[in-house]
Amino acid sequence: MKVLVIGNGGREHALAWKAAQSPLVETVFVAPGNAGTALEPALQNVAIGVTDIPALLDFAQNEKIDLTIVGPEAPLVKGVVDTFRAAGLKIFGPTAGAAQLEGSKAFTKDFLARHKIPTAEYQNFTEVEPALAYLREKGAPIVIKADGLAAGKGVIVAMTLEEAEAAVHDMLAGNAFGDAGHRIVIEEFLDGEEASFIVMVDGEHVLPMATSQDHKRVGDKDTGPNTGGMGAYSPAPVVTDDVHQRTMERIIWPTVKGMAAEGNTYTGFLYAGLMIDKQGNPKVIEFNCRFGDPETQPIMLRMKSDLVELCLAACESKLDEKTSEWDERASLGVVMAAGGYPGDYRTGDVIHGLPLEEVAGGKVFHAGTKLADDEQVVTNGGRVLCVTALGHTVAEAQKRAYALMTDIHWDDCFCRKDIGWRAIEREQN
């Protein structure tokens, strides 16, 4: 069968790489893909943008694609799933209505409140003055979020009132996030440890994926501004068996049932960003209507199941007949980024030292890369590579991932040096 993966990031390289391992699959197309997917023998890039839904549909129909897997959020919010389904094509992802869980933070907070799903106390605002009055009433630390899609960067954790007020002005008056910031959510600052809890949903059944933990801040020890994610590891020891059960009972099931009851039946990957307090009680920080990036990369390295088989089962509402199998080892991925990210950065730098053949127990997933006219791999984004490795402990996986990137370099590249530090502290204690 033929599979189409929509997207061009590290997440899509990992999903396409995994899909190509399925015995059911003869070809995996990636639209538009990157240099990493271009260089994989089993993958084929297609020059179609992720939100060019008419062109994606034409391609899928002409090539007789048997299954489409959607990586990023933008085409989901624009209704790619609705369009493909209307044409009778199998596609794994939520409809535009269901994708509001990521597309609008205000929608999500109101949904969580209606269904009594644990989350931070909050209020929505479209005007500067009422927002500032609320800030003064609540004090800092406090969290300000742009309502719409902002590539994972539309969240400001303000430790002082001045910082919070500046964020409100930037978003509501200063157009810092364009349309995404015309409405904001202000919510209480939650203390605890974060985890990424990702499941597959087929409308009524749920299959949990391996747990993981992302590193949102750009600097070591979680300093500096938020990014799309600087590295991740799996599994996340903070998600104990008890926390896992509470998350399923208090968050995942009520969300899936609540969406169905409101006429937005959810199919696709559902990612709950959790904050887990010292007592092991999870609260929802955010929902994403797709797999996380960079969490996908370490999770796919651990996945032993057939991803395509699982997606097909989900498209037929048969996830209850499936289980997922995982490598017992831990995996860890470190993002190599372009200097200046998450602010302004340069593109077009030649990347040197990429491994020429597959590495046992490791993988360099490409994100912001492309093939230049002379076939050299050059940078083409802020997050450029995710260097990922397996290990018997998170500490060993970390050591192997950093060793794998020793020879890889380009002008002005950087990475965090402490990915996995929370899990490693736990292992050492």
UniProtKB/Swiss-Prot annotation:
Essential cofactor(s): Mg(2+); Mn(2+)
Residues annotated as binding ATP: 135-196
One Pfam family recorded for the sequence: GARS_N
Cofactor note: Binds 1 Mg(2+) or Mn(2+) ion per subunit.
Stored InterPro entries: ATP-grasp, ATP_grasp_subdomain_1, PreATP-grasp_dom_sf, PRibGlycinamid_synth_ATP-grasp, PRibGlycinamide_synth, PRibGlycinamide_synth_C-dom, PRibGlycinamide_synth_C_sf, PRibGlycinamide_synth_CS
GO BP terms in the entry: 'de novo' IMP biosynthetic process; DNA damage response; purine nucleobase biosynthetic process; purine nucleotide biosynthetic process
Catalytic activity line of the entry: 5-phospho-beta-D-ribosylamine + glycine + ATP = N(1)-(5-phospho-beta-D-ribosyl)glycinamide + ADP + phosphate + H(+)
GO molecular-function term, one example from the UniProt record: ATP binding
EC number: 6.3.4.13
Residue sites binding Mg(2+) per the record: 286, 288
This protein's UniProt keywords: ATP-binding, Ligase, Magnesium, Manganese, Metal-binding, Nucleotide-binding, Purine biosynthesis
Pathway: Purine metabolism; IMP biosynthesis via de novo pathway; N(1)-(5-phospho-D-ribosyl)glycinamide from 5-phospho-alpha-D-ribose 1-diphosphate: step 2/2
Domain of life: Bacteria
SMART domains in alphabetical order: GARS_A, GARS_C
UniProt keyword annotation of ATP-binding present: yes
Start and end residues of each ATP-grasp domain: 109-316
Keyword Manganese: yes
Biased segments, Basic and acidic residues type: 213-223
Subunit structure: Monomer.
Homology family: Belongs to the GARS family.
Function: Catalyzes the reversible conversion of phosphoribosylamine to glycinamide ribonucleotide, an enzymatic step in purine biosynthesis pathway.
Protein name in the entry: Phosphoribosylamine--glycine ligase
